[in-house]
Amino acid sequence: MKRLHIHISVEDLEKSRNFYSALFGMEPTKVKDDYVQWLVDDPAVNFAISTGNTEKGLNHLGLQVDSDEAVQELEERLQNAGVSGEQQKEAVCCYAKSTKYWVQDPEGIIWENYHTMEQMELFGGDSFTGGMGCCEPTFSTSGKWSTGGSC
């Protein structure tokens, strides 16, 4: 099953948690001190909020898929359309280990295409982001990943 992924950076986690729980009509799927996630079935959405980012609002969008092969298919489809991006293998981010392919749309919105392999106890900070976190990649003008991102 594919899910649209939406990640919002918030100021007040508890206030936002209460709002989105009411909006979705369900309790969160995952709750941490700095991160909350809902896996909504109708519509199929992986919705997450987190603190720690100085800029509030939309952090990034994404497509969550069922396999590494599906991530590879997305990567190939995007590359065939002339869209360059960055692979991230075994990324530790948002309390999960995932295979990812990050791209940026023509308006600068970051898209995280990914398959989660397992849940983790660590929020982020893998070597791909220079140990600075995850979830908010920064692309240079060439469309390549910069290690300046953080959650």
Task: Set out the residue ranges of the language-model regions.
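N-terminal beta-strand motif that seeds the catalytic metal site of vicinal oxygen chelate
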Residues: 1-14, 44, 61, 122-151
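Short aromatic/hydrophobic contact patches that present stacked aromatics
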Residues: 5-7, 37, 60-62, 100-102
